[in-house]
């Protein structure tokens, strides 16, 4: 499946998304842009199964982590016409 995972700079470095991911797609990397000094990164997007647990776990009002499902998955869900 070709899913993409985007981490936005609204990330607060809480690690909730990393802990929620069952496929170890996300990891934390150093970043000076937040108090925690780290930000989520998605170096293994090819392993993403599109479960969106990382999105659900994100505590920010604007989801800092978003999963964009590939066309094949969207079509099988009946969302694309």
Curated annotation (Swiss-Prot):
One of its GO terms (molecular function) is electron transfer activity. [4Fe-4S] cluster 2 binds at residues 21, 48, 51, 54. Pfam families: Fer4_7 (PF12838). Gene3D superfamilies: 3.30.70.20. Residues 2-31, 39-68 form the 4Fe-4S ferredoxin-type domain. The keyword RNA-binding does not apply. Binds 2 [4Fe-4S] clusters. Cluster 2 is most probably the spectroscopically characterized electron acceptor FA and cluster 1 is most probably FB. Keywords: 4Fe-4S, Chloroplast, Electron transport, Iron, Iron-sulfur, Membrane, Metal-binding, Oxidoreductase, Photosynthesis, Photosystem I, Plastid, Repeat, Thylakoid, Transport. [4Fe-4S] cluster 1 binds at residues 11, 14, 17, 58. Its EC number is 1.97.1.12. GO terms for cellular component: chloroplast thylakoid membrane; photosystem I. It is found in: Plastid, Chloroplast thylakoid membrane. It is a peripheral membrane protein. GO terms for biological process: photosynthetic electron transport in photosystem I. It is an enzyme of class 1 (oxidoreductase). It catalyses: reduced [plastocyanin] + hnu + oxidized [2Fe-2S]-[ferredoxin] = oxidized [plastocyanin] + reduced [2Fe-2S]-[ferredoxin]. Its cofactor is [4Fe-4S] cluster. PANTHER family: PHOTOSYSTEM I IRON-SULFUR CENTER, PHOTOSYSTEM I IRON-SULFUR CENTER-RELATED. Apoprotein for the two 4Fe-4S centers FA and FB of photosystem I (PSI); essential for photochemical activity. FB is the terminal electron acceptor of PSI, donating electrons to ferredoxin. The C-terminus interacts with PsaA/B/D and helps assemble the protein into the PSI complex. Required for binding of PsaD and PsaE to PSI. PSI is a plastocyanin/cytochrome c6-ferredoxin oxidoreductase, converting photonic excitation into a charge separation, which transfers an electron from the donor P700 chlorophyll pair to the spectroscopically characterized acceptors A0, A1, FX, FA and FB in turn. The eukaryotic PSI reaction center is composed of at least 11 subunits. This is Photosystem I iron-sulfur center. It comes from Gracilaria tenuistipitata var. liui.
